[in-house]
Amino acid sequence: MGKCRGLRTARKLRSHRRDQKWHDKQYKKAHLGTALKANPFGGASHAKGIVLEKVGVEAKQPNSAIRKCVRVQLIKNGKKITAFVPNDGCLNFIEENDEVLVAGFGRKGHAVGDIPGVRFKVVKVANVSLLALYKGKKERPRS
């Protein structure tokens, strides 16, 4: 049985479309509001946090590596997240109790590549860009 095609079927077509929208993953995520509640950033693109500890996350098979990450407690809501530290040796620029700026890591709330459960990356440390520190253009402020 196909869809209604006659005259006076507009109400039926419209209500059917309204019902079927909710079976679309993206529509449901955007309109229910539960994804926004579950998101540690609360809809923002970036968030500041305090480094709790440095952790090594093992890469998924078939890769074999320890990806350098940090546990961060967000200032705005106190939620704890794991954030990836990009580039070689950048973990040395980060100490515990540092203030870091964290951003998303690519796939709209999903983990990236072979790093399981890590959905965020570190962008700034003590208000200095991690990339600038890595390239040697800037130095960490002495405190």
UniProtKB/Swiss-Prot annotation:
Q: How is it modified after translation?
A: Hydroxylation at Pro-62 affects translation termination efficiency.
Q: Which residues carry this modification: 3-hydroxyproline?
A: P62
Record's subcellular location: Cytoplasm, Cytosol; Cytoplasm; Rough endoplasmic reticulum; Nucleus, Nucleolus
Q: What is its main location?
A: cytoplasm
| GO terms under cellular component | cytoplasm; cytosol; cytosolic ribosome; cytosolic small ribosomal subunit; endoplasmic reticulum; membrane; nucleolus; nucleoplasm
Cross-link for Glycyl lysine isopeptide (Lys-Gly) (interchain with G-Cter in SUMO2), residue positions: K37
Any single GO BP term: ribosomal small subunit biogenesis
| Single GO term (MF) | structural constituent of ribosome
Positions bearing N6-succinyllysine = K54
- The superkingdom of the source organism is Eukaryota
| Signal peptide extent | none
Q: Which InterPro entries match?
A: NA-bd_OB-fold, Ribosomal_uS12, Ribosomal_uS12_euk/arc
Q: Which disease is it linked to?
A: Brachycephaly, trichomegaly, and developmental delay: An autosomal dominant developmental disorder characterized by brachycephaly, ciliary trichomegaly, dysmorphic features of the face and hands, hearing loss, and developmental delay with short stature. Intellectual disability and autism spectrum disorder may be present in some patients.
Function (record text)? Component of the ribosome, a large ribonucleoprotein complex responsible for the synthesis of proteins in the cell. The small ribosomal subunit (SSU) binds messenger RNAs (mRNAs) and translates the encoded message by selecting cognate aminoacyl-transfer RNA (tRNA) molecules. The large subunit (LSU) contains the ribosomal catalytic site termed the peptidyl transferase center (PTC), which catalyzes the formation of peptide bonds, thereby polymerizing the amino acids delivered by tRNAs into a polypeptide chain.
Listed under subunit, the entry gives:
Component of the 40S small ribosomal subunit. Part of the small subunit (SSU) processome, composed of more than 70 proteins and the RNA chaperone small nucleolar RNA (snoRNA) U3.
Please state which protein family the record places this protein in.
Belongs to the universal ribosomal protein uS12 family.
Entry protein name: Small ribosomal subunit protein uS12
- Organism field: Homo sapiens
